[in-house]
Amino acid sequence: MRNVIVLLSLLFLTSCSPKLVYTSDNEKITINYEQDTITTVSINAEYPLGEVKDAEAIRNDYMKVLNDTYGERAVKDVKIIVRDNKIKSVTVLDFRTIKDLSEFGIKSPYPSLNEFEKFLKSSSFRKE
């Protein structure tokens, strides 16, 4: 009986937070959603290292750009790792609070999963 309860709990937890993953050559995008509404998007990307090698300075500059572009409430988290002359960034955005969704191919007044998926596919991302 206990095993059945644990199994049902796991099924419930995983069904409550569905997600989709899209990849390109240097990016991985994980979309969390409820029905057709995107909640958060996590973007993992890797880029060549520029002149600045300090991860905290890169993070602060990147956060400023993201906040100016999407709105301060939209940026949930940014992690920067500098390794092997590359920058790895993990950015989490709350799509429900982004001020201009058209940058992500979304014309609806809400963060539409369907429209964002079309945008990703047209931008050469592949669904995993």
Predicted segments, located by residue:
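Subset-of-secretome marker
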Residues: 17-128
